[in-house]
Amino acid sequence: MSEEAWARSAGGRAILAESPRPVPSRQRSNGVVRLRVARAGIAADGPTRIVDLAEGGPLRLRFPRQGAERMLEGVLVNTGGGVACGDVFEVSVMVEAGAACLLTTTAAEKIYRSDGANATILNRIEVGPAGRLDWLPQETILFDRARLVRRFEADLAPDASLLVAEIAVLGRAARGERLEQALFEDRWRIRRGGRLVYADSLRLDGAVSDLMARAATGGGARALATLLDLAPGAEARLDEARTLLDALPAGVEAGASAWNGHLAVRMLAPAIAPLREAAARFLAVWRDRPMPRVWQS
């Protein structure tokens, strides 16, 4: 039967086969949170209140406690459960003069296996005069073949305070996963009074687990942390920081240094559990207050 005869085989009516539907490209997520907070009233220890909050995509920001405390605590929630290749997540925070805010995450952030595209996380911070922000997310877990590009940018007033803690886990420990092929690119740029005071870049590309196994790079570490304090007077607390690090759990290697008006702590461990415990213990003493409740769950 010819194509024309076949097409007219149903009572003389043309029956045209539908063209195959195009296969949809992988769905990407664009998550956005924009937050602005300010101090309520004129008292120096007045509570911090939300001035403006915008949310988009799978990112949400929740405030479990809004009492009379000066520091407002917020919890970032990724309703998508993780970050996939091609996703772009952006968090922007403005802390106005005299206000104080703590931001954490509801759980560890998972960076899924990529089909080639990068996942991108952009964090932009601004802290006004005498303001304070504690940026304390829970750990980021990179799956094998994950590709993550992360940027952290902050602009601080001359007397503002910023405390940052970032923990990365290279592979899912429960599965004994190795990063045979992955990308982790982490870039920090922090300015005070318009002047660059801290710049740090990390790039792990390729066989990351093999790279971290080398003595000169990670010594077999599968979890790493950077804690950075840019509060006025932080540089003068170097001896205190080193004393705290001497009491960390076995298996955690750590060091502290201070220069240019800030203090930095690095930690390495073969697993996330001891490193997470070490970071939480250090931060609780350093901040002189308990860690957020989500860290204790």
Curated annotation (Swiss-Prot):
Pfam families reported for this sequence: UreD
A molecular-function term among this protein's GO annotations: nickel cation binding
The encoding gene: ureD2
Subunit structure: UreD, UreF and UreG form a complex that acts as a GTP-hydrolysis-dependent molecular chaperone, activating the urease apoprotein by helping to assemble the nickel containing metallocenter of UreC. The UreE protein probably delivers the nickel.
Protein name per UniProt: Urease accessory protein UreD 2
GO annotation, cellular component aspect: cytoplasm
Function: Required for maturation of urease via the functional incorporation of the urease nickel metallocenter.
Top-level taxonomic group: Bacteria
Compartments where found: Cytoplasm
Keyword Chaperone: yes
Keywords: Chaperone, Cytoplasm, Nickel insertion
Organism in which the protein naturally occurs: Methylorubrum populi (strain ATCC BAA-705 / NCIMB 13946 / BJ001) (Methylobacterium populi)
Keyword RNA-binding tagged: no
Similarity comment text for this entry: Belongs to the UreD family.
